[in-house]
Amino acid sequence: INTQVIANAPVKYLWAGIGDTMAKFYECTTSARGDGDELDHSTSMGVQISNLCAKPLVKYGVEALEECKNHRPGKALEEVILGIIVSTGFVSNLVGIDLNTGLAHACYNGFTVCRSTEEHGHLHGEIVAYCILILLKVDHQEDEFKKIYEFSKNMGFPVKLADIHATLDD
């Protein structure tokens, strides 16, 4: 992967890609729970790999954005790119349709019909990043919610409805 090409691309796409990629871990792991059936080998491997769709992004995300803004790829940008492209690619191919999406993307789909959200041209990953917070609250993952809430603030991701221009009237 030529990290310089990505470092020269608009930062907003890397930013949104981070938000979307992180959902892969949270949706995959929550969807895999409680099915009653034992997961087959490929699916289990995909669920385990999904950790690499979030952990490196949380660790390196802010620094990777800086490297991209400065058009100087380094370790942080490389780790984030690998999470977005390689880890997500493996997980998507290993876990099957039932674990490839979940509450964060369902909420995203709901926000796409909100006129106020649509009018402001929010990127897919931007709204999905907010919807990860919804998923964590609904799933009662309070410690993880706090961690991802702080990460989201540091990344400039939305952390409240007003940040995506959604209103109760929508």
Region spans (language model):
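Proline-rich low-complexity regions
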Residues: 3, 83-86, 158
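Secondary-structure boundary/capping residues
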Residues: 31, 66, 120, 160-161
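C-terminal charged capping/lid subdomain of soluble metabolic enzymes
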Residues: 140-170
